[in-house]
Amino acid sequence: FWSTAPSTREIERADSLTGFDIVKYVINLEINPQTQFINGMVEAQVIPEWPLTSISYELEGDSLQVIQVLVNDAPAAFTHQNGVLEIPLPPALRTTFVTKVFYEGVPNRSPSPYNIGMIFTSSAVYTLSNPDAGRYYWPCYDHPWDKALVDWNIRVREDWLAAANGIRTGITDNGDGTRTHHWVSSSPVATYVMGFAAAPYVEFLQQAGDLPIQNFVLAGQLDNAQVDFANLPAMIDFFANLFGPYPFEKYGHMLVPMTTYAAMEHQTMTTFGSAYLSGDQEYESIVAHELAHQWYGNLVTPITMREVWLKESFATYSEFLWEARHAGWEAGCDYLRDEIQQYYISWENSNGPQTIFDPAYNMMFAPPTYEKSASVLHMLRLKLGNDAFFSFIRSIVNTFPGGNISTAEFIDQAEQAGGEDLSQFFQQWIYSPGIPSANFTVLQNSEGMARVIGTSVSPTSTMFDLDVPIRVPGSAVADSVVVRATPEGCTTYFSTGLVDNLSEIQIDPNHWVLARSFTQNRMQLAGCLAYDRAVDLSWTPFAADIPLAGYEVFRKQLPDGDFTCVTPAPLNALNYTDSSVANGNTYLYYVTAVDTEGYRSLPSNVMEAQPIEFLFDQGFLLVDETRGGSGTNISPSDEMVDDFYSYVLGDFSHTVWDLDEQGALSLGKLSHHPLILWHSDEFSNMQIIDNLDLLGSYVLSGGNLLISGWKYPSQFDPAFLNRFLPGVTPVQNNLAVLVSAQSDAYPDLHPDPAKLAAPWNGRLPMSYVFTGAADPLYRAEIFNAGPNDNEPLAIRVEAGGTMVLLGFPLYFMLGGEARDFLAQVIPELYPEVGTDDFLIPAPVLALSCAPNPFASALRISCQAARGGDRVELNIYSPRGQKGLALSGQAGPQGDCGFEWDGRDSAGRAVAEGIYLLEMRASG
């Protein structure tokens, strides 16, 4: 429970000069739950450490009136102002004395954000004092560094039970409809964990060995309580084995309908929120948390709330300890990751970096105190080792029982247990803000040695030195190797034994370290382009800042080959062409970096390639990825685009492939076409990004490619840019500023105003220029000679074949100019276009159909060259759009028949008209 609002109070610092020690309180309360009026008398036994002239208690709230004060049963003067009760003492008072303060009134609650003290509901009264709200309902020296015994005498209505610290010694019937409940503690208690609750309770008793467990619940809560607290005896035994024997005379719970906290660890008697009694042990972590406080917080208490993390770290960490014990180590690690580490990281993402030590008053009970500090304990356990860590946390209980501890004393105990200087560890985690990340470079040599370079990265000025466990593949121990990560980078060497591949190495698999992320510098194979008898590979530079000898490429032939290095020596380049491959085979590739000491990086990702033969035997292919718009000027329908390309291509013989209707293309399909015009005429839904490797392989194999469309350069990935456009930067002109495409070699191209939005004023938006390109076909004319004026607007790239990139969609240019441009550029790319195809010997095939024309069904007869040949039949519109594909197997005499009902592949009836049949047969 916390608030980021500015605190109106500061955490009080321990005052060693008070001159007195309160050894016992006797608190007598008469409570009227209807009027919320209380009568109280608090007796305090005080030992002066030197002669005192006065003593002060805190008692806040304007409606609480002090009636009388006695010192050693004699009336004494007093003042009660601004929440401080000041009592002058006889000048010669040097020995133990007793004060009695009589008071009455309606107690107030403490200010926001806590709003606690004595709390009344319709069916209960209870107290919450953490961090310093005892003073709002009884006069006390309300500071955690002065612990005292406490006896409670609580007078409430006769049908209620009252539960409190210590052992109940009796219940007195007052004969007036009330009873007084007497509770006596035998161990010193800090004021913030003194507390009681009263309600129409029933008692539910348990036993943990000789330890009595008293649970006070409402009758309707009993069944749920018996389930939710069923594991409490085992939990006490488990924590006793870890921390030391349970330290007090009893334990238990008192159920209350509180809304401030989930629960509160009052010494020997936890106050538990009714909302968290589910009957299915859903909130057992709260049970574990509050129980652990009996050792850390109650037996050993932070000297001030500046050190509040000392108690909440152990309680929160104990949630994980119990989960790991009860549900298994893996479940415990999941709990640690999700409910502690990630919970805190999410909180810090919203609230900013925080320091654990000395929080603001309003932030004492925020996640830095709980989840972050619990994470620190877990990392300390890793640093010290299991045996030393648990010895250390037991030493705290043994060294400071019944007393207080400071952060400095905690650190001193840890250093004694671990035998090392832990100043850096605690400086970065307790006294400084931030959560680090870390990056690791893992390398391995052929002699069975590994080298790990760890670098920590901090979002704040905190310099983090991290110990991070790793899991080595094949190791039986998950966290057997611990490496360091420092701001400047730290190198750790270790033997890998028989493990010859560290690819599956895991960084901190059991979540020991509170970190935003762990990353590894791994090689990234960015491109793997298969073409005719070769594979073109490209990769990104190795990110690690280490001296490199170069890069090595490894290849494996499927199905059962082994990876072998195909580069005779480390390469300095970021690409490699493997020409020692055969068409039709499938290969896998990865790349590694090699440093100057002979250590290899972990393998990159694996990519697959299958070189194939490029026959280029089927002429010009037009690929249409336009899905079709609304038919408005800037959103053309598919038919409008088809009509445009039918016009601008004129008499050029070509085949159409509609990606939206016919699906994805294969490299095998492209390998038959020496020229491809790929166009996209929509603002979005671009499909070219899924085909970059395909097109790259096509061009490298000698294919000729012309690309036209909106914004398609934005889809080019780094591998494509590096391979085909080195030194070229595509730059978008987002606004409607393109006036024309200008060229000395080709017809100028102007946007077609009829196809543009009126506000564009005849100018084209979202055009691209190619800064740095060396062979422009066109340059951009920009409105008012604005930015990117005269920059390359259409370029030619030579890479085995030729690629022509237009920084604009050809559809939106004037049709006549576009037609003239294509009439010139297409024969340059593919001189055979429009002439007879290559003369390729082929078997004699026969194809006939009847009736022709037909109304409902067409019988198609095919004659293959040989019996058993595979026969494919494709049906096209006159514009070359494939409507249907059929297949079958020829009979013994090579005959094969099909029937067509006039529907396309989607089952739609085709329009009346003339259709073309294409027959293909294997062999």
Sequence positions of predicted segments:
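Acidic/His/Gly-enriched intrinsically disordered linker/tail segments
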Residues: E312-M379, K383, F400
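N-terminal, polar/Ser/Thr-rich
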Residues: F1-N39, I119, S123, S423-Q424, ...
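Amphipathic alpha-helical substructures
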Residues: W50, A366-V452
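Hydrophobic helix-coil surface modules that form long, contiguous segments used
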Residues: G40, N130-D132, C140-A288, Y317
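C-terminal outer-membrane/trafficking sorting elements
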Residues: L839-A850, F854-G923
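Zinc-dependent metallopeptidase catalytic helix centered on the HExxH motif
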Residues: T271-D334, I393
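Helical hinge/lid and interdomain linker segments adjacent to catalytic or ligand-binding clefts
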Residues: G279, S630-N722
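A glycine-rich, often tryptophan-bearing local segment used as a flexible ligand/cofactor-contacting loop or short
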Residues: F683-R763, F770-A773, G816-P827
